[in-house]
Amino acid sequence: MKHLVIALSILAVLTSVSLASESTSNPELMPLEQVRPGMKGHGMSVFQGSKAERFEVEVLGTLEGVPNPKQSIVIARLTGPLVDRTGVFAGMSGSPVYIDGKLVGAVAYAFPFAKEAIAGITPIKYMIDIFEQGQKEEQPRSSQHVSFTTLIGQSASTSIGSLPSLPSSQIGARSTAGDALAPYVGQTIVPIATPVTFTGIPQNVVDAFAGDLRRIGIQPIAGVGGGSSLGPMVPANENTLTPGSSVSVQLVRGDFTIDAAGTVTHRDGGRIYAFGHPFLSSGATNWPMAESSIVTVVPNLNNSFKLSAAGNLVGAISQDRATGVYGQLGDKPRMVPVRLKVHTSRNKTETYTFEIVSDPFLTPLLTRITMFSAIAATERQIGSQTLKLSGTITIDGQSDIKLDNSFTSPSGAAMFAVNAVAQPLAVLLNSGFNALDLRGIDVDVTSIDSRSSGTLNRLWIDKTEVRRGESIEMQAFARNDNGSEFVERIPLVIPADSPIGPLVIIVGDGASLNQADRTQPSAEFSPRDLGQLVRAINKLKRNNRLYVRVMRAGTGAIVNNEEMPVLPPSMLATLGSSRTSGGYTPLSVATLAEHELPPSQFMIIGQQVITINVVK
């Protein structure tokens, strides 16, 4: 009897060690060549809470050339009381599968609307190999051609079309209608959807941006996850992100939370392999990696999904590629801190603090979503509205980007306001300058439940013949929305270097002059460095004030992307000679002076032109 007790104790210890080895140490890997139909094993995934639970797996065969050339996936049937209730569910991606104690790979693919839980398994070798190869330092990027028409698009558009084009992806958000392959839905194997939880963001806001989100492969789920704090990183231990546990890829954290839920396939020391298919296929990344717990898995006839809540920050996701995502415990993610203060139309102030991933495509989009949510939480979206926006975008080693604008609309101005912040971010992040390091975004928005605008009707000037250096007075007449007329007095000094002859004086709002600038040679340029790009963005005119521009017909030039309106004939001849090429664009109309007027009581919209004559 004593020997039997000892034997059973040893067996229990060995069994415990065997199970622990799958989660805390490196299990032996099973090559794809050894996988045969009929083989049975088990998988691990979290169905509730944070503890991974077992389900059974039976190999049915392999598909060659799927999902990519020279690759194959294992087709298997999943069974067990938990899987039988939910089927293959969104968020299950990455669940490890073991046969004879060896790691085969990750549950990653499924057939939509299948009656049984039939899944595709990404072989673990593919997941490891793709992240072992090409782990090189990021190569310096060259500056891109930046257009002022892109910058000023914010004043005329409320759609994502005004921002740099988002890449289209069907990963995790494949449509079941309106697609050329719609008749074959259910007959094709697709990546298991990755549920992305939106916390603090109303459903109507998620709906407003659903098209943009689905284009890049995000399946939004609103208001079902728990928020995450801006707490510091928690040191990892042997129980952190073990195989089968739930992992969260955080895109926004703080008062707003946007995070994607998946499952850890393999942990090798501090290296984490998960998902088994791409999340957004973004390549090199630097996103927060957090622990995650599951509220429940919701059975759904279309696509079951898990409700998750992000937990402690434990590292960073550094790769998002064809066979999964890869992260490193202890690595610090690169985030952009945001402070957003909304002064409501009812004299209250709401402050939001959060962080957004630093990414050329995601940062502008997520900024729009979070800002729109903050405004929509307290302000109306139908009816006359004026939003006054101020703030800064802080860049390490550069001058701040100044935000100072107003937007008014009879049907809500929020989308115009959020674009005014997202647009400079998009241009900066897509400029190609490696030196760019966004240190923070600080924005104040003041809301008024009425329109505060007027239309510029006419100009008056006290004299039409002037001398160089002489002071004159102009008056700009504008009419506001209720029909009342008011006058803006504008003192003006004629430039001392004005040529004899006619001068054109233009008075207009920032948006009108920005649109006029689109036709000028200076509207498109390739900045030499980040500092020049920052100066160009800060030169953009604002909607909430008038500008006075004095112009003349004549000869000037743009030299090395800087406008030089007055150049002597000898210099123009040298620049235009056959011995000189590049960096030179002639100008037929030159701006002699330009003045920004202080903000007025109303937003004045429109543009008027008057001509004077300079005499001796």
Region locations from a protein language model:
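Bacterial N-terminal signal peptides
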Residues: 7-16
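Terminal presequence/propeptide segments associated with secretion/organelle targeting
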Residues: 19-616
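Positively charged n-region of N-terminal signal peptides that target proteins for export
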Residues: 1-5
